[in-house]
């Protein structure tokens, strides 16, 4: 089947028992046992649930992996993956990593002597120079959040394999519709499914897909042991959201390209971060490893413009956390998504106070552009 059909018919399609077209919501915590050690495949919903299992098989199909796992949030998924490591291990991470991922590494896993090395993962030599006997994995976001840096997944995976390391890719911004990290050589893919996969800002979920049986067994053990599983109802909502992923992502892509072109030469804006510009340093890599440029843009306001006033002037675009919904969302990374990252690191990589991150929705693109134009004009200090 082609990808668009797998979105609708992949995983467990419908219900054989009743003939229902959609997978039912198995809203149960426990299951009747036939006898000692004898059951119909389920014992307790933390360990396994038919609705969640349908979702897990679906995301494994979409990412072309060996096993999929559904968690109660993107951070629960990330935490499960980081739980693969032990005291003394180090992980190479990008220098503008999502703030929540940095926080869990810096404030929680560091307590267990699991460390990290911050590098510019777009620079392959810098990655190589930071590999030593303690490094166990290279963690990649591409595009990065929020500066849209592009890392060559295939080349990073080659480095990992030659050093017996894991390659972990957060594929939230791209989704498997645009980019398939496992096919490019990654070992583990993570999604905050709250975002584009769910697509409607009505659920919180995380997904993990792995490329081999050993990792499948390990992640399943961690999932069951730590218990951060996705509920049956949210699993159902996510399956439903995924069905329309292709049509939504096509609209996100086209709208975002138009918005980026609008922002590019505005006098109020100092810089636009968008991997779909040919002058973007990662454009050729992005064009090679993905079939689109996504629905995210970040931009820096010029001096003389107040980001606080800009947010106040927005009307159609919502000022708020998150991304990837049908509605356009704007946020302030320095105080919101990346507030957990130390000020010095934020300044060094470019997460400055005047940086705004925009998740372009699927509204009429002219309405989005007009809203941005009003907000940009309204953000002028004493103007």
Please state what every model-predicted region is.
Residues 1-49, 55-58, 356:
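N-terminal "arm"/small-domain region of PLP-dependent enzymes with the aminotransferase-like
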Residues 2-4, 10, 271, 278, ...:
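Positively charged, small/polar-rich N-terminal and surface patches that mediate targeting and assembly
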Residues 9, 69-268, 273, 284:
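Conserved PLP-enzyme active-site core in the AAT-like
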